[in-house]
Amino acid sequence: MALGGFDGAHIGHKILIDRAKSTGRIVGIMTISGGKSGKSLFTALERENIFRSHGIDFALELEFEEIKDMPPEEFIEFLEKECNAEIFVCGEDFRFGKGALGTPETIKALGKKVFVEKILYDGDDKVGSSLIKRCLEKGEMERANELLGFPFFLQGEVVKDRGVGAQIGFPTANIPYPEEKFPLEQGVYETRVFVDGKEYKSITNYGARPTFDNNKVVTETHLISYMGDLYGKNLQVQFIEKLRENKKFESVEKLKEQLEKDVRRVTKDD
């Protein structure tokens, strides 16, 4: 069983998962939500899809408040009973139990088999959810994706909105950004959308609509070359690169000109 926060599965987590898979046993991971880390990189549904793509057999989702006062020894015993865990895999900085007193050495002292992996660094920075969040806050999408090992994404159902995009020739799929999901830096992004098993290049505005004097933060995506109704469909929007800041244009025509430039930039290699 792989142990860690597993707010998604970044390249450091992938090392733990691969080690767990190398044992030839059923592979499970333990994830913890809540606590000091605040908002998560991914929702529970998004994490489920990530874990499935990594070949995880099951995930045990725990709330920090439920386990924070559990002594380390009791916590390991809980995992053994709950998941029939026989082999543990964790990073050398893994801490658990009341007061974060449990360490990999604690697991060994209990007579359990445990594989301990070294901390992974990107330059001078420790690879982890905190570093990825800092990248998202600054719009450094390419670095965030390198640390994740896959594109950061939003998954959800398309809802009806005012239809302003369609009125100016750029229809958009609007997906509510979950309250529990860590926010990006506001701006316009190059994205990829997967719908009905097909991939579409796209541009996504995450933020307000200043040209229309609307300060509500939205996530609206224009799928290039898509024809059809997206309302009610479940989409995955992958963020590739930040194209520009969100800004107020002096007219709708100026906004359309900029959107056309954005589309040309995204499709320049086609």
Task: Report residues per predicted region.
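Residues at the starts of beta-strands that form the adenosine-phosphate
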Residues: 25-28, 57-58, 86, 113
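Glycine-rich, highly charged phosphate/nucleotide-binding loops
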Residues: 40-47, 68-76
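A conserved beta-strand->alpha-helix junction
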Residues: 57-67
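Generic structural signal for residues in well-ordered beta-strands
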Residues: 59, 114-116, 237
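Phosphate/ribose-recognition catalytic cores of enzymes acting on nucleotide-derived substrates
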Residues: 161-270
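Classical nucleotidyltransferase
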Residues: 70-172, 194-195, 250-254
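Structural recognition of alpha->loop->beta junctions
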Residues: 52-58, 139
